[in-house]
Amino acid sequence: LAKMKIEQKYLNEDDVGFMIAPRLNAASRMDNPMKAYELLSTDDEIKAGTIADHLSKINDDRKTMVASIMREVNSKFGKSPLREMKEVIVIGNPEWRVGVLGLVAGKISDEHKKPVFVWGKDENDLIKGSCRSDGSVSLVELMTETSEFFLEFGGHEFAGGFTVHNEKIHFLEEALSVSYNKVKRDKIESEIIYDVKSDLSIVNIKNWREIEKMAPFGLANPKPIFLFESVNIENIKKFGKNGSGEHLEITFSDASKNKVKAISFFSNNESFEVPLVVDKKVNLLATFDLSRFRGKEELRLRIVDIL
């Protein structure tokens, strides 16, 4: 925690999910999974510090690798417009590291709202990969329907892993798309799901303290989602480690001149249903977020969606 500048008394589910877990997972994605075990089991502070530094470094390497793969993916998609895409996206490169492909598949699925299969080659020259669903189909059902293409597969309805016959990889997208039309779920009209509708005046420390009493938040206890209708985009700023600009900070205002900052990690101006333009009015879905960066408390919003 000290290495990540997290104060133990303020440790929360976001710190675990976005700071600690990625570093532990980096051990299996980029190195030896035993490194994570050694960190959690050692009583030697010096050894723990050395391992923590190593995991932070390979986690940074993992981020760089994923960003590089995503640039390659976006370049390929630029040559293949969305209207030409199949119902299921299959994309890969023998040079891509298998351990990070689940992260890549998740990003592509979030962006294109389709099931995605991403593959690379492992040290045994086997084509392996990860898949993620947008919720329109169970991946287990989809892969079962297309089982003759796989040497192995497994997972659950939203995420999975697979090994493909080398000679069949170039036909996998077509086969999965045919299977998709057999096992896809009936499309349900999307609706805006939120807990509270309000103006921006509700965003204050007093209300945050009340929300905080319901923590820890997670899958079975999600953070309350607030809907702010017809708020104005005052300012858009990119930020990130070493000037990467991989995150967004947007300032919103409402009719009563209340102003609030809102952030979205790993996002850009094209990440939402509507284009982000200063002075544009939008509907904002967000949760409360208290930052304690460098010991300074700042209440802001975490963007769920912009409509």
Spans of model-derived segments:
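Short glycine-cluster motifs
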Residues: F117-S133
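Short coil/turn connectors at secondary-structure junctions
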Residues: E84-E87, E111-P115, D125
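Residues immediately flanking
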Residues: N93-P94, G106, K121, N166, ...
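Non-catalytic terminal/interface segments that mediate subunit docking, oligomerization
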Residues: T42-D43, I91-E95, S109-F117
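Flexible, glycine/threonine-enriched loop-and-boundary segments that flank and lead into catalytic domains
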Residues: K79-G106
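Extended beta-strand-rich architecture
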Residues: V104, D110-H112, F117, V203, ...
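Acidic, two-metal ion nucleic-acid-processing modules in DNA metabolism proteins
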Residues: L1-P22, A26-K76, C131-L307
